[in-house]
């Protein structure tokens, strides 16, 4: 069965993750930062959106491509960085990179990644972005930037 049929909504994915992942790993993914205020606000805003199908009406294909920082992407969204993604699935960031490249959307790698920056970059290519949490050490900071840039 195709994943889209097994998991018709995010709620189904949520329940499957709770069953499959170790508790510490699930809690990391499921929670927000701090008191979770941002997570609560995002959920409330999304709950206000209603998608209304319009049957038996004329329709035209929608062009969803967008240019951002001089590069053309197929969609106006990308794959956000997730720290310690490898705790959820081995080499998850590399899977994200492949999916982002295939879909031609930006894909971000967190400073708290579980794969080599260079391996991610080799797969993501121009679609790869790097989310830098600057360390106190200027030397380490410069090294991270150099590795992400090259």
Which stretches of residues belong to each language-model region?
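Conserved, mostly hydrophobic/aromatic
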Residues: 22, 79, 100
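Glycine-rich phosphate/pyrophosphate-binding beta-alpha loops
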Residues: 81-87
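Hydrophobic faces of well-ordered beta-strands that scaffold small-molecule active sites
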Residues: 77-80, 107-109, 128-132
């Amino acid at each position: 069965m195709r994943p889209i049929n097994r998991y018709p909504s995010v709620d189904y994915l949520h329940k499957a993750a709770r069953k499959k992942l170790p508790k510490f790993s699930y809690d990391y993914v499921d929670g927000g930062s701090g008191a979770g205020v941002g997570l609560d606000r995002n959920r409330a805003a999304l709950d206000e959106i209603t998608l209304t199908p319009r049957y038996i009406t004329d329709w035209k294909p929608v062009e969803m491509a967008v240019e951002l920082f001089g590069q053309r992407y197929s969609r106006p969204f990308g794959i956000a960085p997730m720290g310690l993604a490898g705790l959820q699935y081995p080499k998850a960031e590399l899977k994200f990179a492949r999916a982002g490249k295939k879909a031609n959307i930006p894909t971000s790698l967190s400073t708290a990644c579980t794969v080599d920056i260079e391996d991610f970059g080799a797969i993501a290519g121009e679609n790869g972005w790097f989310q830098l949490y600057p360390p106190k050490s200027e030397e380490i900071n410069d090294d991270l930037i150099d590795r992400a840039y090259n």
